[in-house]
Amino acid sequence: INVKRTVPLGLALLAVSNPMNVGVIDALSKMSHDPDGEVATASIISLGLVAGGTNNSRVATSLRSLATYYSKEPGLLFAVRLAQGLTHAGKGLVTFSPYHPDRTVCHPVVLAGIVSLMHILLDFDSLVLGKHHYLLFVLACTIRPRMLVTLDEDLKPLPVSVRVGVAVDTVGQAGRPKTITGFQTHTTPVLLAAGERAELATDEYLPLTSVLEGVVLLKKNPDHVPSALDEGKKTKKPGGKDDPISPSQIGRIAKPLSHW
């Protein structure tokens, strides 16, 4: 029985803040109706961890139905409310994942907080529903922002174009291989989902860090050469092609046409 209670926690540990793993969500949804209350509790909170900070609509709908299903069981209803809080944490701007967005480096403090929470959930009724509910504050060390914000050297917001796509493993590859695939171009600030990586779409600025996540400082690139499009925008004179036609110009154009 004890081994069965750890299965949902192990599944959640594999996909923290990664609701794109549909198989894990399906398995946890089935186990959330288990006759064993401990298994159901662990499955419900695991659903919240898998969708933590993502506002995932599928998990949110499942948790709302579970709140109705367990409306007369206070312990399980508390677990559902906790899972809902994890799902909508930070209004979708934070993550609980121990990995950085491109899943290349693990954050040890976040991993320690997640593992500590797993140990607490092994005895949820005695600890959290007893006198030690404050143990849930270990979640505080697991919360990290998942947005990318760019600032200039004066710490003022600096919107720039970035390409966001699925991270590609480039370890051991020669030359300068592509680091992302299937990218889309956005203007900062942007949100990075699990497994995504961002890179600057312009060489006008240089990042002061090699990993684009969280708050990134940018500085002007001294070797940047403005493109012809940028020069055209700066040197455009009044009366150009896009200027509106004045009434006097309309009269001069229409006067010769009146002879026809």
Protein language model regions, located:
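Long internal repeat-built scaffold domains in very large eukaryotic proteins
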Residues: 1-260
